[in-house]
Amino acid sequence: MTDKQNRIHALICSVVTYLKAHRSCLSGVDITLDKLGGMNLSDERRIDIPPQSTRHDEVLRNAIAGIVAPELVEIAACLKAAKDDLVWREDNAQFYQQGADLGKGYTKCNLHTLLIGLDACGYHHPDFSLGIFMLGPRTLYRDHNHEAPELYLNLSEKSGWRFGASDWEDYPAGSLIWNASGAPHATRVYEQPFISIFIWLENVNSRCNLVHCDDWEEIEHELAGLGSCCFQT
């Protein structure tokens, strides 16, 4: 195996280790670990494809540098080591219906890479995705849902989340978020970029759907002009 493949494998293992330490915290963690436990992640199944850099490299480096929580030290070190081995892609609304308006902030700076999944750089899987997701500072990831059940492991120090009609709530680094199939959710990013582990457990080819809320423009204006100090949590 190549050094690159070993670094990607180590990154996957660091995520699995964290999830195992938080088994039973959320139903989604147990389901995810069961799925991963049934996969063949042996050396001979590793993929070796060329890396792909990104125009958002400076934001990405800042996001990784901002992973400072002690419980995330292993993931942070492995991600830093493997960053230039990964295939980084932008979402240009290809996961949404044609014409979906995702907002200027999201369009300006979003990034993801798959470690396990379709077109992944670690291991191929036809109906499971595990990867890294990043958003630029002061971004609203508008309310949306999807058929794929989703687990987030937040790596950033703070990010705001809204689930359905609930109020916004801030979540710290190391927090786990479970979005059941079809459950609406939104994310707001403050002065520092947002970075997380994301996992889609099935239905990875399903589309995302915007769930309209009347306050999108107001939130985006506040994020762009004032930062997180204007929000009550």
Q: Which sequence ranges carry the predicted segments?
A:
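Short acidic-glycine-tyrosine-enriched beta hairpin
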Residues: 125-127, 151-153, 165-184
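Double-stranded beta-helix
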Residues: 190-233
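Structural motif
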Residues: 158-159, 184, 193
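Conserved short histidine dyad/triad with adjacent acidic residue
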Residues: 113-119, 128-146, 167-168, 180-183
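A short, N-terminal "cap"/entry segment at the start of jelly-roll beta-barrel domains
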Residues: 9-125, 225-226, 233
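An internal, amphipathic alpha-helical element
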Residues: 93, 107, 136-137, 147-155, ...
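Short, conserved beta-strand element in jelly-roll/cupin
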Residues: 132-138, 145-161, 200-202
